[in-house]
UniProtKB/Swiss-Prot annotation:
Listed name of the protein: ATP-dependent RNA helicase dbp9
Provenance organism: Sclerotinia sclerotiorum (strain ATCC 18683 / 1980 / Ss-1)
GO biological process, one term: rRNA processing
Positions with biased composition (Basic and acidic residues): 353-368
GO cellular component: nucleolus
Length: 607
């Protein structure tokens, strides 16, 4: 029997071959056959390190506290054993009850977990039912969903606590409880909700805590929910050449926009890119700026409806969009709480010290009152894009605004180089000497960029990673400066506010009024795009085209694709002007008169 070939035309190893080599396979983990079919349908070849370690322990009934890097397959590590135990229980007793509660910090992550459950249960969908409580539906609809006692409930701590208090969510038969992204849950302000859930939960529930870092927040949750858990600190060995290549550029505030223009217009980055900015207004300012050069992008922020945000991520993963501009408000607003002094042995000293430094800086930032009270729209507390969300095949993470902590930086760059792939992280840093030199493009968080960069370099060095300087040929870049200036002046504060209001109105209409229509007509959803033009105050069509004299000689062919224009099949001996002259001369000789039917027509009758 012929074996399938991978992208490098190398035969894919079979499970028998991997088992012979001592590698764990999904079949060797003892999972249900129907789940193995669902795994095969997802084209998973072999379990990752966290999956091979956590799944057997979960099947044994042990509590688990696992730390593994982003993109290492933590979701499947806790879902597969839970689904297996539900299927085995139903073979013995078909009684319907809620067996598993999965708590996540954001709506986007809840939707992702729900879709993962659906994919794994493709061959046992009738036996396992899951409900996502983070959808924007009325309380009556949520009660009706929970009335059937779904096997798995996915919710944020706030939704779970609310429904448990009203007895809509019954936890009496609960056997499994998972907190995904455990180090982020408390920073979203879910302390009281988690304590309430812990009081209502029956004793003896198996608990799994999944996190990318082990911090004091995780220790708090461990003391609240776990009973002598198995602590897994997993560091996967990266193959040579794989992982995230990290670069930094020190530049002025307006040069950020210049470099972004050059990067995308000259196609210096190939593939999909996520651009992180400091606040919502920066999202729209950057989008309006790029639009003037014909570069399309879509926006993710907490003011957009949740359905729109989820749809943007789905379409990005389907390669419909190449550029997402995402605001990371939680990090900028200093939502990382300062760790408590009592650190236990399980909390790593490096992470703990880094967290304390990051939290101090974040608190300094929040203490300073803003000079202007800006009228802001309603933000979604349960929004989060730099953590947990599985963006697929991201080539580059661009930190347009540097985060305020090394922890935030780690999770941002974790959106690329997932599941053994390679990726690039490029960060713009404002030196203190250049801070506030260009006020229209300045942002408050850039004041401490150099301090944060020093912490990032130190933190990455402890992991054996290097943050390298990225050198642009500024002589060639400066040739684009006047075009950047024209575009930047067109993006005024009024244009930003108008664009923000316009897009939020459009997205609300798409999200609420058309939701049912798209459920009934899924083909129409293809035409719903989120990267349409918002139009700045002054449209300058000439900026969309880069003249040849600005293009570098070496890279011109790569940008134009070697296009030399139209080439005719026949040689043209005369040009347009000479042809016109010849025609005019012919008219002068009388040929023009003969060709005029009014002068040559004769009405004589035939004899």
């Amino acid at each position: 029997m012929k074996r399938k070939l991978d992208v490098n035309d190398v035969p894919v190893p079979t499970e028998e071959a991997e088992a012979a080599n001592g590698k764990a396979t999904f079949a060797s983990l003892g999972l249900d056959a129907r789940l193995l079919q669902g795994i095969a349908k997802q084209n998973f070849q072999s379990p990752t390190l966290v999956q091979s370690k956590a799944i057997p322990l979960t099947l044994e009934g042990r509590d688990i506290l696992a730390r593994a890097k982003t993109g290492s397959g933590k979701t499947a590590a806790y879902l597969l054993p839970i689904l297996h135990s539900i299927l085995k229980r139903k073979e013995l007793s078909p009684t319907q009850c809620t067996s598993a509660l999965i708590l996540v910090p954001t709506r986007e992550l809840a939707d992702q977990v729900y879709k993962t459950v659906e994919s794994f249960t493709a061959f046992c969908a009738k036996d396992v039912r899951a409900v996502n409580l983070t959808q924007r539906v009325s309380d009556a609809v949520q009660r009706s969903l929970l009335a059937d006692s779904p096997d798995i409930v996915i919710a944020t701590p706030a939704r779970a606590s609310l429904n448990a208090n009203t007895s809509a969510l019954l936890l009496t038969n609960l056997t499994h409880m998972v907190i995904d992204e455990a180090d982020l849950v408390l920073s979203y302000g879910y302390d009281e909700d988690l304590q309430n859930v812990a009081k209502i939960m029956p004793k003896g529930v198996q608990t799994v805590l999944m996190s990318a870092t082990l911090t004091s927040e995780v220790e708090t949750l461990k003391g609240l929910f776990c009973r002598n858990p198995e602590v897994l600190k997993l560091e996967e060995a990266e193959d040579e050449g794989k992982g995230v290549s990290q670069f930094v550029v020190k530049c002025a505030e307006d040069e950020k926009f210049l470099l972004v223009y050059v990067i995308f217009k000259l196609k210096l980055i190939k593939g999909k890119c996520i651009i992180f900015v400091g606040d919502i207004d920066r999202c729209y300012r950057l989008k309006l700026f790029l639009e003037q050069f014909g570069t399309r992008s879509c926006i993710l922020n907490s003011q957009l409806p949740v359905n729109s945000r989820i749809h943007v991520v789905e379409e990005f993963n389907k390669n419909v969009y190449d550029i997402i501009i995402a605001s990371d408000e939680h990090e900028v607003l200093g939502d990382e709480d300062e760790p408590k002094p009592e650190e236990t042995e399980e909390v790593e000293a490096d992470d703990a010290s880094g967290e304390k430094e990051d939290a101090k800086d974040a608190k300094k930032e929040t203490k300073q009152p803003s000079k202007k009270k800006q009228k802001t729209g309603k933000k979604d507390k349960e929004y989060g894009v730099s953590r947990g969300i599985d963006f697929k095949n991201v080539a580059c993470v661009l930190n347009f605004d540097l985060p305020t902590s090394s922890k935030s930086y780690t999770h941002r760059i974790g959106r690329t180089a997932r599941a053994g792939q390679t990726g690039m992280a490029l960060s713009f840093v404002i030196p203190s000497a250049l801070y506030r030199k260009h006020k229209p493009t300045s942002i408050e968080s850039a004041k401490d960029d150099e301090k944060v960069l020093a912490k990032i370099i130190k933190h990455q060095a402890k992991k054996g990673k290097e943050v390298k300087p990225y050198n642009f040929d500024m002589k060639q870049v400066d040739a684009f400066r006047y075009r950047m200036g024209d575009a930047l002046r067109a993006v005024t504060s009024i244009a930003v506010q108008e664009a923000k209001a316009r897009e939020i109105r459009q997205e609300l209409m798409k999200s609420e009024k058309l939701k049912r229509h798209f459920e009934e007509n899924p083909s129409d959803l293809y035409h719903l795009r989120h990267d349409g033009e918002l139009r700045p105050a002054r449209v300058q069509a000439h900026l969309k085209h880069v003249p040849d004299y600005l293009l570098p000689k070496e890279g011109k062919k790569g940008i134009t694709g070697g296009d030399i224009g139209f080439v005719g099949m026949h040689k043209t001996t005369e040009n347009r002007i000479r042809k016109a002259r010849a025609a005019n001369k012919a008219k002068g000789r009388g040929k023009g008169r003969k060709s005029d039917p009014l002068k040559t027509f004769k009405a004589k009758s035939r004899k």
